[in-house]
Swiss-Prot record:
Catalyzes the ATP-dependent amidation of deamido-NAD to form NAD. Uses ammonia as a nitrogen source. This is NH(3)-dependent NAD(+) synthetase. Gene3D superfamilies: HUPs (3.40.50.620). GO terms for molecular function: ATP binding; glutaminase activity; metal ion binding; NAD+ synthase (glutamine-hydrolyzing) activity; NAD+ synthase activity. ATP binds at G43, I44, S45, G46, G47, Q48, D49, S50, T156, K185, T207. One of its GO terms (cellular component) is cytoplasm. Pathway: Cofactor biosynthesis; NAD(+) biosynthesis; NAD(+) from deamido-NAD(+) (ammonia route): step 1/1. Its EC number is 6.3.1.5. It comes from Tropheryma whipplei (strain Twist) (Whipple's bacillus). Disulfide bonds: none annotated. Deamido-NAD(+) binds at R136, K169, D176, H256, K257. It holds the Pfam family NAD_synthase. The keyword Metal-binding applies.
Length: 271
C-alpha cells in the first residue's frame, strides 16, 4: 500500500536538490509561456512551503523575461488581523524577492461572513469551520488578483500534505499549478537550503494557523503525526505498523479532497 501511495503522489525516495530546482523552475517557465498568462499569484504565509514555491516562481518569471516575454510574480500577504509570526512572513518575502508585493487583511471579510452565518444558522459555527472559511477567503482573494492580471494561482501542496489530506478543500487546496507536488517535507527543506534560504525559514515549525482558539498550532500536533514519519512512509523507509496504519487511514478518508467532485459516472468511492 505504501509503494502504491508513493507512486500515486509521484514521490521519489531520493532527490538531487539542484536537479529538482532546475526541473521545477523549467516546468513553471514552460507552462507560463504555454498558458499565455501574465504571471503567477501566490499567497505568502511565512512558512517553508510558500517560501519555496515563491522563490521557484520568481526564478521562473525572471527566466521567462530573459527571453523577451512579460512575466510577473505577485506575492500576497493575507493575514487575519495581526499575524503572530509576521516577522517570519517578512523574512520569507525578502528571500523570495517578488516582483510585486500585495497585502490584504482577511479579518473584516471573515468576521462579517461569520456573523451573518451565525445569524442565519441560529447558532455559532465551530472554530474549525471558521478556520476553513479563512483558507477559502484567502483563495478568493488570490483568484481575484489573478483574474485582474490574467495570471495563474500557485498552490503549495506537496506529498506530505497530500497523503494526509492536510489542506482545506477549495481553500489552500485550490490552485492552477502545483510546483511542489511530489516533494516530501524534508525534500522541500533540502531545496530551500540549496536556494540559500536562512535557517529561520528552513527550520520554522509548520502551522496552518487557522484556529482562533489555538493560534500557531503546529501541524504535527493537529495531525497527531510527525513529518519525519510521514516522509519516511512516502520514501519507502521503515516506519512502525501504527504509523503505517494511521497514514493509510488518513489517505483513504481524505481521498475525496484529492478527487474532482463526484458525478454519476464516478466509481472510486465504491471501492
Amino acid at each position: 500500500m505504501c509503494c502504491d501511495i508513493s507512486k500515486t503522489l509521484c514521490v521519489k525516495p531520493f532527490i538531487d536538490p539542484e536537479e529538482e530546482i532546475s526541473h521545477r523552475v523549467s516546468f513553471l517557465a514552460d507552462y507560463l509561456r504555454h498558458s499565455r498568462a501574465s504571471g503567477y499569484v501566490l499567497g505568502i504565509s511565512g512558512g517553508q512551503d510558500s517560501a519555496l514555491a515563491g522563490r521557484l516562481c520568481q526564478i521562473a518569471v525572471e527566466s521567462v523575461r530573459s527571453i523577451g516575454f512579460d512575466a510577473t510574480l505577485w506575492a500576497i500577504r493575507l493575514p487575519y488581523g495581526q499575524q503572530f509570526d509576521e516577522s517570519d512572513a517578512q523574512t520569507a518575502m525578502q528571500f523570495i524577492s517578488p516582483d510585486e508585493e500585495l497585502s490584504f487583511d482577511i479579518r473584516s471579510a471573515t468576521d462579517n461572513l461569520c456573523v451573518d452565518l451565525n445569524r442565519s444558522l441560529g447558532s455559532k459555527i465551530s472554530d474549525f469551520n471558521r478556520g476553513n472559511i479563512k483558507a477559502r477567503l484567502r483563495m478568493v482573494v488570490q483568484y481575484a488578483v489573478a483574474a485582474h492580471h490574467d495570471a495563474l494561482v500557485v498552490g503549495t501542496d506537496h506529498a506530505a500534505e497530500a497523503v494526509t489530506g492536510f489542506f482545506t478543500k477549495f481553500g489552500d487546496g485550490a490552485a492552477d499549478i502545483l510546483p511542489l507536488y511530489g516533494l516530501t517535507k524534508g525534500q522541500g527543506r533540502a531545496l530551500l537550503k540549496a536556494l540559500g534560504a536562512c535557517d529561520s525559514i528552513i527550520e520554522k515549525v509548520p502551522t496552518a494557523d487557522l484556529l482562533d482558539d489555538l493560534p500557531c498550532l503546529p501541524d504535527e500536533t493537529e495531525l497527531g503525526l510527525q513529518y519525519r514519519d510521514i516522509d519516511a512512509f512516502l520514501e519507502g523507509k521503515p516506519v512502525s505498523e501504527d504509523i503505517t496504519m494511521a497514514i493509510t487511514e488518513r489517505y483513504k478518508s481524505t481521498l475525496h479532497k484529492r478527487m474532482p467532485p463526484i458525478t454519476p459516472h464516478s466509481t472510486w468511492w465504491r471501492k
